Amino acid sequence: MTRNATRILIAPDKFKGSLSAREIAENIAAGLREILPNEKIDIVPMADGGEGTADVICDALEGSWVTCKAHDPLGREIDGRYAYIENKKLAIMEMSEAAGMRRVQPDERNVDLASTFGVGEMLLEAVGHGAHEIIIGLGGSATNDGGFGVGRALGFRFLEGDEELAGAVAELERLTRIELPGDVEALATASAYSKDRRLTQPPLQLDLPRIIAAADVRNPLLGQNGATRVFGPQKGATKDKIDLLERALTKLADVVSKDLGVDYRDEPGAGAAGGLGFGLMSFCGAEIRSGFDVVIEAVDLISKMKDVDFVITGEGSLDRQTLEGKTPAGVARLAHQLGKRVFAVVGRASKDRQVREIFDEVYVTSRLGMSEKESTVRVAELLRERARELAQSL
């Protein structure tokens, strides 16, 4: 009597700066097949709202890519792109496409000048393309403007008395009032950008579709756990600059509450992407959701996991942050709920017991004495090697 083939599901995130989620999954699958050639292996690339989210959902739903003009964090014109699922009228984009760290060189990082204006431009492009729903991943940001730039792109006017603020985050300390775009709740179908970073064409009447902001962190906008104090230093903000930015975003939240009648500063995820979560909720009526939850729905992970025997996940670095909404922890929890064994294949791993105990076993690609450069260059080979070890242990 022949036994049924073991069914294996591989659902990793990307290894940041190295391979995509699909490439990670394919290399793990290749290693497994060397030892287990007759087993059934399913691949479901994953993301958690950070960079790679649009690729994963576009891949799963067989979408296409739309290119558009936008501006980077420092106001330079770029060719951006977002995914579009025609039969669902669904656009999927990442804020990092316009306002990400990858758009600026290390010596250009300036969180006072960096703006999310280009993100607003991309939102308007998707609306003009016919999107009835927009998912936007909040990760990899170079900005800390609380969505100030997005608001300006949509036609909101940020004023000190009768003088319009030009776009630098520090100017928000002088903010006294916010005017709605054009006619009440009108939006621009096409943005215009001048050298002084101001909207130069009046917005036209247009209703926003449903917008879901997919976040991989739950930080509020302000305070010790807020956008500026937690993530500002990673973007080059000094202690003095952090205090200034905190005051600026506090003023923004106060005036939004006064003039728009909403106050999302304490909402989980408001601090994501330099406070863009707050801005999208305030200016677009967006819903903040766990990026992992958004992705598992889009790729239908639960139904794909129900019939497998065990699950493999992974990411570049397994540490305490993994437990805060990252892909491996989400996959592990879902696997446990469904009674599946779950393994992790990762680039690096903390020795923290709380992190490791959610997996049946953790396989690490890097080895003692191996430089980060070597482990990055050899990552495909090392993934296959660890996958062979995993297969032999089954």
Segments the model singles out, each with a brief description of its role:
Residues 2-138, 142-394:
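N-terminal loops that bind phosphate or other acidic moieties
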